[in-house]
Amino acid sequence: MGLESEKADVQLFMDDDAYSRHSGVDFVEAEKFSASGPDRDPHRLNSHLQLGFQDVIAEPETTHSFDKVWICSHALFEISKYVLYKFLTFFLAIPLAFAAGILFAILSCLHIWIIMPFVKTCLMVLPSVQTIWKSVTDVVIAPLCTSVGRSFSSVSLQLSQD
């Protein structure tokens, strides 16, 4: 699960007429690598991270650099993105996966053994609390509010201009 059984052969294309519609880095046999292996993002959680060179760097029609500079910068962008991602995942993927596993295990344990029993207990006790609260409001708060209302209803103010 997640282990690579084949090595990916990578080629860099830098021909003048195909650079604008090509991503720069490509698999030698793209159909072999796209069809094999499980989908690592089946729910498309990281579909927003599929950025290309044109999504990051763009030159308007009025200002263009030399074609060779554009092609080389495109190739360097794609290669550095590819190599740096591989380098970072080589060093960070296992420790971060371990830390995320610990975090999710702790959160799951807290949710299962503390939060949900507390919520269920509150929901179970709630009808009793509701009955007690209704009795307290009927016995204490309702007469108090009624007497205050009657006291203030007999107050009348008259303003006179002297």
Curated annotation (Swiss-Prot):
GO terms for cellular component: caveola; cytoplasmic vesicle; focal adhesion; Golgi membrane; nucleus; perinuclear region of cytoplasm; plasma membrane raft; sarcolemma. InterPro entries: Caveolin. One of its GO terms (biological process) is negative regulation of endothelial cell proliferation. It holds the Pfam family Caveolin. GO terms for molecular function: D1 dopamine receptor binding; molecular adaptor activity; protein kinase binding. Phosphorylated on serine and tyrosine residues. CAV1 promotes phosphorylation on Ser-23 which then targets the complex to the plasma membrane, lipid rafts and caveolae. Phosphorylation on Ser-36 appears to modulate mitosis in endothelial cells. Phosphorylation on Tyr-19 is required for insulin-induced phosphorylation of MAPK1 and DNA binding of STAT3. Tyrosine phosphorylation is induced by both EGF and insulin. Its main location: nucleus. Residues 87-107 dip into the membrane without crossing it. Keywords: Cell membrane, Golgi apparatus, Membrane, Nucleus, Phosphoprotein. Belongs to the caveolin family. Monomer or homodimer. Interacts with CAV1; the interaction forms a stable heterooligomeric complex that is required for targeting to lipid rafts and for caveolae formation. Tyrosine phosphorylated forms do not form heterooligomers with the Tyr-19-phosphorylated form existing as a monomer or dimer. Interacts (tyrosine phosphorylated form) with the SH2 domain-containing proteins, RASA1, NCK1 and SRC. Interacts (tyrosine phosphorylated form) with INSR. PANTHER family: CAVEOLIN (PTHR10844), CAVEOLIN-2 (PTHR10844:SF3). This is Caveolin-2.
